[in-house]
């Protein structure tokens, strides 16, 4: 029997009343367990196996699917559960984590980062910015290391910078002619991308960003992911469509 602290990142129906629950845990990394009877409303496993739930878990199992014996809810992130926009961002965070990681490869930092992101979304901080931070932090997990602290071509640390997927990072004005397809970004967007990639989440504080800046950030991050990650996430497509509708509604209300 093994014990762990984890976050439920995916759940699927299994048989009539059971669930297969995918968790990311502090001790073991990503694991899967069968939660017998968890679909029944009166089951002692019903609450602790809900998506996004952070809890303590006890299970039997080896390298394959384990069997969940009991669980205790630490945090259920109730605000996320009750808000469709928060839910969409949190779902994307969890799917990205699921697709980017292998079974039983512990990474306590990644566990803590995911918990902090979900907690901050739940507490009402900007979910789009938090998700963009998470996307940048997940790049090394995917084996991707864009050069963000200096020019990816000449190594200079000063000057004006654009973002180049071709050169795998930012490039300075001295090297602009070497990538005609580079992404020209406002200076503050380049700085934020660098901050998101390099600085710890707790050092970033509460970042207040204009909608236009967030759109630039998303364009750069999406372009990089599309070029290098090899991932297609349904939750990301839904999230981008939802963002478009939300922005249209905001513009209509402002007119």
Swiss-Prot record:
<keyword id="KW-0234">DNA repair</keyword>
<dbReference type="InterPro" id="IPR012340">
    <property type="entry name" value="NA-bd_OB-fold"/>
</dbReference>
<dbReference type="GO" id="GO:0043590">
    <property type="term" value="C:bacterial nucleoid"/>
</dbReference>
<dbReference type="GO" id="GO:0006302">
    <property type="term" value="P:double-strand break repair"/>
</dbReference>
<comment type="function">
    <text>Involved in DNA repair and RecF pathway recombination.</text>
</comment>
<dbReference type="Pfam" id="PF11967">
    <property type="entry name" value="RecO_N"/>
</dbReference>
<dbReference type="Pfam" id="PF02565">
    <property type="entry name" value="RecO_C"/>
</dbReference>
<keyword id="KW-0227">DNA damage</keyword>
<dbReference type="InterPro" id="IPR037278">
    <property type="entry name" value="ARFGAP/RecO"/>
</dbReference>
<dbReference type="InterPro" id="IPR022572">
    <property type="entry name" value="DNA_rep/recomb_RecO_N"/>
</dbReference>
<dbReference type="InterPro" id="IPR042242">
    <property type="entry name" value="RecO_C"/>
</dbReference>
<dbReference type="InterPro" id="IPR003717">
    <property type="entry name" value="RecO"/>
</dbReference>
<protein>
    <recommendedName>
        <fullName>DNA repair protein RecO</fullName>
    </recommendedName>
</protein>
<keyword id="KW-0233">DNA recombination</keyword>
<comment type="similarity">
    <text>Belongs to the RecO family.</text>
</comment>
<dbReference type="GO" id="GO:0006310">
    <property type="term" value="P:DNA recombination"/>
</dbReference>
């Amino acid at each position: 029997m093994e014990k762990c602290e984890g976050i439920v990142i995916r759940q699927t129906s299994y048989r009539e009343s059971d669930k297969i629950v995918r968790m990311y845990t502090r001790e073991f990394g990503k694991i899967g367990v069968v939660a017998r009877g968890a679909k029944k409303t009166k089951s002692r496993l019903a609450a602790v196996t809900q998506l996004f739930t952070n809890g303590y878990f006890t299970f039997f199992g080896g390298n394959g699917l384990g069997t969940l014996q009991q669980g205790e809810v630490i945090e259920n992130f109730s605000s996320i559960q009750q808000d469709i926009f928060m839910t969409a961002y949190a779902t994307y965070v969890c799917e990205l984590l699921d697709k980017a990681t292998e079974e039983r490869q512990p990474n306590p930092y990644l566990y803590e980062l995911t918990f902090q992101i979900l907690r901050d979304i739940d507490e009402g901080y900007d979910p789009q910015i938090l998700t963009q931070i998470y996307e940048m932090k997940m790049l090394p997990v995917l084996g991707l290391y864009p050069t963000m602290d200096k020019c990816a071509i000449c190594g200079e640390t000063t000057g004006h910078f654009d973002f180049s997927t071709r050169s795998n990072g930012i490039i300075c004005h001295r090297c602009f002619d070497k990538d005609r397809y580079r992404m020209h970004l406002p200076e503050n967007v380049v700085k934020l991308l660098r901050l998101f990639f390099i600085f710890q989440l707790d050092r970033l504080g509460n970042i207040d960003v204009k909608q236009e800046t967030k759109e630039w950030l998303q364009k750069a991050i999406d372009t990089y992911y599309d070029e290098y990650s090899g991932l297609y996430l349904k939750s990301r497509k839904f999230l981008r469509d939802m963002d478009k509708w939300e922005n249209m509604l905001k513009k209509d209300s402002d007119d």
